């Protein structure tokens, strides 16, 4: 079955509301227009004359400033010490720190840069240990195993969340109650509230980098994935959240949910592209945008479904021939799956320091997770070919199909069982991101009775009325 035929047979029941998309676009336009007349200096001045406040302000500004790409190891150590001092002061002072935050952008920048430096340091340390070429740096890293340690970073993020009572505040908002009643002494301060909130997004990112995808999604239990969420006000945070949620779904084989997440943010980005140009995060967003198109190509190949017209056109433009190869399956598609996955996956990290004395035992975390993903792809490699034969019959002998495919009958039986199991996916409906209902992801179903295959096919017609309404709303 061609991509277009499958697309017509699988209407997307989870299309985002165009009204909500328009509201997000308008909100982002207002943010950009407002920020155009406000320099970074304007945002961070007039915060008080007290020297202590000014010192803290300077530390926060430094914490939000990206580290130089070619920074030395000593500079990375010093940056870690500065973050420790800053967060220790914020979390362990006698009472809440009195400081008015300039905007929610600032809190995101601090958490984002903190995690980025942690991630880049872990990858750098792993490269030094695996290469074994720079003994001086290896010795320095060996003597400081806790610098940028996984436990320290997670401890900071969880402490900021706990101190701000942000999860309790978000849960109260979902129940329609006053969040200030649950904020406490610290959570009522914007400084703690903003840092706590974006620490939740930071935890999503860190757990995903560590390969714990279910825990990554669990951290967002109290955050609603809609335009009212605070992260949607910051473009980089908005993009980051949907990227890591979508990727976590993909690694959990919930391809339908992954496609829904990727599609939402890609449509939003396509409609705000003109407002992003010239922004500090434009290049990073453009790169992540390309990565998500690669991931959505993988998901659509493994789980054919109907896409938004904008996404469909862009996907065909970027990966036309490659997408056809992915969908046809077979051994020749394996290198392409791996190439796209490596180019689009997060830069995974290890939770523990490497073994500097035995470089050969250190494994690249990206290689590790790529191997896990490719094992899953290999399990479904012949599904398109098998489906193309089964669609021609209502009953078919197992040995006959094995002859067509030139494989042993028992090997074919295992393929059919794997395909049957993979066709049952959990799809999110409401509640937490980990929740969902089991659904049959394919329009083709079958049952094995000894060596006889019983085939049934269901086709859902396109919802033309909905299609016309969506496109009329865009035109008018």
From Swiss-Prot:
Q: GO CC terms on record?
A: eukaryotic 43S preinitiation complex; eukaryotic 48S preinitiation complex; eukaryotic translation initiation factor 3 complex
To which protein family does this belong?
A: Belongs to the eIF-3 subunit L family.
Q: State whether keyword Cell membrane applies.
A: no
One family from Pfam that matches here is Paf67
Q: Quote the subunit structure annotation.
A: Component of the eukaryotic translation initiation factor 3 (eIF-3) complex.
Where does the PCI domain lie? Answer: 257-452
What HAMAP family does UniProt report for this protein, alphabetically?
eIF3l (MF_03011)
- Keywords of this protein's UniProt record, alphabetized? Cytoplasm, Initiation factor, Protein biosynthesis
Q: What is this protein called?
A: Eukaryotic translation initiation factor 3 subunit L
* Any single GO BP term: formation of cytoplasmic translation initiation complex
- Compartments in which it is found: Cytoplasm
Q: What does this protein do?
A: Component of the eukaryotic translation initiation factor 3 (eIF-3) complex, which is involved in protein synthesis of a specialized repertoire of mRNAs and, together with other initiation factors, stimulates binding of mRNA and methionyl-tRNAi to the 40S ribosome. The eIF-3 complex specifically targets and initiates translation of a subset of mRNAs involved in cell proliferation.
Is the keyword NADP assigned to this protein?
no
**GO molecular function per UniProt:** translation initiation factor activity
């Amino acid at each position: 079955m061609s991509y277009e035929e499958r697309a017509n047979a699988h209407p997307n029941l989870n299309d985002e509301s165009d009204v909500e998309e328009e509201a997000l676009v308008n909100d982002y336009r207002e943010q950009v227009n407002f920020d155009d007349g406000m320099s970074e200096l304007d945002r961070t001045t007039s915060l008080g004359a007290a020297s202590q406040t000014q010192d803290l302000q300077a530390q926060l500004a430094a914490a939000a400033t990206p580290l130089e790409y070619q920074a030395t190891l000593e500079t990375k150590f010093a940056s870690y010490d500065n973050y420790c001092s800053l967060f220790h002061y914020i979390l362990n002072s006698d009472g809440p720190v009195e400081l008015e935050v300039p905007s929610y952008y600032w809190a995101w920048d601090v958490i984002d840069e903190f995690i980025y430096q942690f991630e880049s340091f872990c990858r750098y340390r792993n490269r030094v240990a695996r290469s074994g070429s720079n003994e001086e740096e290896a010795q320095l890293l060996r003597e400081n195993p806790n610098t940028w340690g996984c436990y320290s970073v997670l401890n900071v993020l969880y402490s900021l969340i706990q101190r701000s009572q942000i999860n309790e505040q978000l849960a109260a908002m979902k129940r329609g109650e006053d969040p200030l009643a649950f904020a406490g002494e610290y959570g009522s301060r914007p400084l703690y509230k903003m840092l706590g909130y974006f620490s939740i997004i930071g935890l999503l990112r860190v757990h995903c980098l560590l390969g714990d995808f279910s825990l990554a999604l669990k951290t967002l239990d109290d955050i609603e994935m809609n335009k009212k969420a605070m992260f949607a006000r910051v473009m980089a945070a908005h993009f980051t959240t949907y990227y890591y949620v979508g990727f976590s779904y993909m690694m959990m084989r919930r391809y339908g949910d992954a496609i829904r997440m990727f599609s939402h943010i890609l449509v939003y980005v396509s409609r705000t592209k003109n407002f992003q140009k010239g922004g500090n995060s434009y290049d990073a967003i453009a790169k992540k945008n390309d990565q998500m198109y690669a991931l959505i190509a993988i998901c659509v190949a493994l789980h054919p479904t109907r896409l938004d017209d904008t996404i469909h056109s862009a996907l065909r433009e970027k990966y036309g021939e490659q997408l056809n190869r992915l969908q046809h399956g077979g051994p020749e598609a394996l290198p392409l799956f791996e190439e796209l996955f490596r180019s689009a996956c997060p830069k995974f990290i290890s939770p523990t320091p490497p073994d500097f004395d035995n470089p050969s035992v250190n494994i690249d975390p990206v290689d590790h997770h790529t191997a896990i993903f490719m094992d899953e792809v290999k399990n479904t490699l012949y599904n398109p070919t098998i489906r193309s034969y089964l669609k021609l019959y209502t009953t078919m002998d197992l040995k006959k199909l094995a002859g067509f495919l030139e494989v042993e009958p028992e090997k074919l039986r295992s393929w059919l069982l794997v395909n049957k199991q993979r066709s049952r996916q959990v799809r999110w409906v409401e509640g937490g991101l980990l929740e969902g209902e089991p659904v049959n992801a394919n329009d083709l179903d079958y049952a094995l009775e000894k060596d006889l295959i019983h085939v049934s096919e269901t086709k859902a017609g396109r919802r033309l009325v909905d299609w016309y309404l969506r496109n009329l709303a865009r035109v008018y």
